[in-house]
Amino acid sequence: MVVVVIVVVIYLLRPVFEPKASGITQLGNVKVVNIQAAMDGFDIAEIRAKVGETVKVSLRSLDNEHHTDGGGKHQFAIDELGVNIIANPLSVNSGTFTATKTGTYTFYCDICCGGRANPTMSGRLIVET
């Protein structure tokens, strides 16, 4: 029984102790965005890209399936660009899109955590020339 309790505690606390794997890098003509989402929001608030640049987003959900709000899933969506990436609990999911025109776009998670109304569950993609 004690072993079961220890395993459950480790499983639930694992995201707290895992190293952060977020950041934005450039790989040739591809902007690589590794972004993490948890109940307290995204860990990146602003992304910059150039017109015509390919953007690869890897979204990691740090929450487990026991969260009552959204079941631990998180989303990275940009309506104007047709982007909708959903990461399952404690998982990573990726998607790629091309920044086709200049402007400032809002990315958000509308699955949990108050959705678009929560300022920590949104950010900006700025596409420049």
Model-assigned labels for residue ranges:
Residues 41-45, 79-82, 91-94:
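Short structured motifs
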Residues 54, 73-75, 104:
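Exposed beta-strand and adjacent loop surfaces of beta-rich binding modules
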Residues 9-27, 87-129:
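Extracellular/periplasmic metallocenter environments
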Residues 24-55:
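N-terminal edge beta-strand
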Residues 60-89, 115-119:
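Histidine- and aromatic-enriched segments that form or immediately flank copper-ligand environments
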Residues 1-3:
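N-terminal Sec-pathway targeting helices
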Residues 39, 53, 61-63, 80-82, ...:
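A mature extracytoplasmic/lumenal domain signature
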